[in-house]
């Protein structure tokens, strides 16, 4: 159950939301942050998506409306659903006294899902926005690690997540940006209201990023409200 706003402000936020593009450092930051807190859980949006065993639809650049940037079709439905589910899990943890750290891109319909589920709660909202050059280099550097992960997880090269990864490998071979969805996410971040703490972690090591988040958590605090929908 959500406590009163004044009580939440006194106690501090029990939910963190860390968003940004792929390779922005969300997962690494969240895991390190969780270890620095006395009782904390990491709720990863991608893991919510992976709960869909059959019919899973990972978004690709062609799924985005060129005008609004919103995802269309089943990809959009599943994207909004995974963030909704991540926020529901985070709320359950928070109500049990466990700090929850949610990570996902959290733009457009995903941000609306967050508003719907976490409205009236105090959240530490963080946007990680490294430079585009850093994002692209990290995308290339992560390919071997992701290949090993997917090989261990799936025995089917036609699995949607494996197929999406194969597209990024081909992009690297062609000299194109590894994550072509990056531009869509960046435009979505531009449409977010300027709430919480926005940080360019380019050139920072992960521990320093966490130090900064803890030192500046008051700047990240945001009382979630429906009047703050993205532009």
Model-derived features: where do they sit?
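Hydrophobic anchor at the beta1->P-loop junction of P-loop NTPases
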Residues: 18
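Walker A/P-loop
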Residues: 27
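ATP-binding Walker
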Residues: 24
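Conserved phosphate-donor/acceptor-positioning beta-strand/loop module used by diverse small-molecule
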Residues: 104, 119-142
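Small-molecule kinase domains that catalyze NTP-dependent phosphoryl transfer to phosphate-bearing small molecules
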Residues: 145-209, 225-231
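P-loop (Walker A) phosphate-binding loop of NTP-binding proteins
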Residues: 21
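Conserved substrate/cofactor phosphate-moiety recognition/catalytic segment
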Residues: 31-87
